[in-house]
Amino acid sequence: MFLFVAMISPATAAPTVFRFAGQSPPDHMATKMMEQMAKEINEGTKGRVEVKVYPASQLGNYTLVMEEMIRGTVDMACMSVATDFDPRLEILYANGYVTGYDAAKKAFDPDAWLPKKLNEFLTPLGVRLIGSYIEGFIGIASAKEAKAPLDPKVDKGLLTRVPNMVCYTAGAKEMGYRPITIPYPDVYQSMQTGVCDAADGYPTAAAYTILGDVIKYWYATNYSMEYLGYMVSDKSWKKLSPEDQKVFLDVAKKYTLKSIDNAKAEDEKYMQLMEKKGIKVYRYTEEQLRPIKEACMNSWEEIGKAGAGTELMKEFKQHLGNI
């Protein structure tokens, strides 16, 4: 009898269930990729791990989910990285370190300097970054034409909404824009009523879907990107065998690169939709964007002084200044 039980127990053992938290709507590409990842992890671990996807912030917003991952009550996430837990994490949102899709693949390869550095800050908190989701590049959406958009030394003549983060405020100034902080829900009305002329911080798709009726120009300056991290609770990670950990890492790397290819296609799709709507779209090569990248690099020192640390930003510049 004992022998019979021992023989069947491995085959009937219940799988380890991972709750995978997302912040995007159910029909969003980020959620679709989460579902594809869940399927491939389930298959790759031969059913030993069952990943269940919870989109649309069902398990909480990104800050709460980070807290839950630290506790081990949420296993993994595809969400914004909460910088509240360590100001050094804000390097992720620095402007100008990648201005194109090939550069993004180099910067966000899980074995590259930036993901490894981010893990130096996240692992002590109890969270591991295993990959990245790049939704799309960020440009300038404007109701008025910008003066010399590729020359950072020229005042653009645009009062520009920026997210309330040092990296965006400092970056906008270096690019020649006059920054003003306006809450995200109020940007449309602010542009409609002339409180501001332009908006910084919107990826291409969001600029079209949210601001498409109030903008006349889109400058694809690619100085930043909409970023989500594939993160795993360290407590949950330690429940996995080395073999199953490798499955997670391989799948996360695959979907990091896949997200960047998708971002390129989505950015172009929405720029074409802008053009059909009558919005003037300016596309640029990475070579044309080099002056903007160099201008944004001047803002990195300010990010260091604001809490990230000047030595860290020097290291950041060394590794990402010429990518």
What are the functions of these language-model segments?
Residues 14-105, 123, 128-323:
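N-terminal secretory/targeting leader peptides
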Residues 7-13:
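Sec/Tat signal peptide C-region and signal peptidase I cleavage site
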